[in-house]
C-alpha cells in the first residue's frame, strides 16, 4: 500500500469512528397534576440518566399552589447520590420541576456551571436544564453583553436562559418567549424550561438531541 493509500485509509477509519451522534447531558422535567412533590421522582430520573453525565447534577422545583415565583434549587458536583441526601429531597417541596446531569462540552467543570440554572427577572423566575451546543454563542453573548447582561457562568445554557427571559418581557407567555428565543439560537439542543406555574420542553428544529 502506498503512503497516499495509507493516509486515505487512516482518514476513512477516523471518519468511521467519529461519524456518530455524540449525546451528552441528561435533562428531566415533570409536572404532577395531583400536586404531589416531585423532587424524589426527578432524583430517580436523573439516576437513570446518569450515564449521560457524571460531573454535576441538580434539581429545581416549584409548588404551583404556593407563593407565586418561588423556585427551590439544589445542585452540586458529583454523582446524584453524592449531591443529594434524603433530607435535601424532602425539603424540596413542589409539584413541578426540572433536573440535569452534566457532561461538559462547553464551559468548565465547576459548580457555577452546574444546572438547572435559575434566574430571577422582571417577569418572575425561570428554571432551565439544557443539553447540546450552540454554534452562535459568541455572537449572542456579545449581543447580550452590550445590553448589560452579567454572566455568572461560562456555559451557553445561560445564554439561552437570558434569551428566553428577554423575550418574555415582550411576549405574553413563557411558551411564546421560548419560541421567540429559539428563532435566534442555532445548534443542536434539547431543553426543559420551568416557570413557577408551567413546564415546557423544546428541541432544536432538526431534533438532533433526545428529549
Residue map of PLM features:
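Conserved short alpha-helical segments that host acidic/polar catalytic motifs at enzyme active sites
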Residues: 2-211
Amino acid at each position: 500500500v502506498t503512503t497516499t493509500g495509507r493516509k486515505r485509509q487512516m482518514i476513512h477509519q477516523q471518519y468511521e469512528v467519529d461519524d456518530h451522534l455524540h449525546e451528552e447531558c441528561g435533562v428531566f422535567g415533570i409536572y404532577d397534576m395531583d400536586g404531589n412533590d416531585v423532587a424524589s421522582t426527578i432524583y430517580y430520573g436523573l439516576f437513570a440518566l446518569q450515564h449521560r453525565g457524571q460531573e454535576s447534577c441538580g434539581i429545581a422545583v416549584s409548588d404551583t399552589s404556593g407563593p407565586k415565583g418561588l423556585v427551590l434549587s439544589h445542585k452540586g458536583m458529583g454523582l446524584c447520590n453524592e449531591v443529594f441526601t434524603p433530607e435535601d429531597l424532602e425539603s424540596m417541596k413542589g409539584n413541578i420541576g426540572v433536573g440535569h446531569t452534566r457532561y461538559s462540552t462547553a464551559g468548565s467543570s465547576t459548580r457555577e456551571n452546574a444546572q438547572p440554572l435559575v434566574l430571577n427577572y422582571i417577569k418572575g423566575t425561570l428554571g432551565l436544564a439544557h443539553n447540546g451546543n450552540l454554534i452562535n454563542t459568541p455572537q449572542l453573548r456579545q449581543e447580550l453583553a452590550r445590553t448589560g447582561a452579567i454572566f455568572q457562568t461560562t456555559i451557553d445554557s445561560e445564554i439561552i436562559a437570558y434569551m428566553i427571559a428577554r423575550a418574555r418581557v415582550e411576549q405574553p407567555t413563557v411558551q411564546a418567549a421560548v419560541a421567540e428565543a429559539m428563532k435566534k439560537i442555532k445548534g443542536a439542543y434539547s431543553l426543559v424550561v420551568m416557570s413557577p406555574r408551567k413546564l415546557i420542553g423544546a428541541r432544536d428544529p432538526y431534533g438532533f438531541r433526545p428529549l
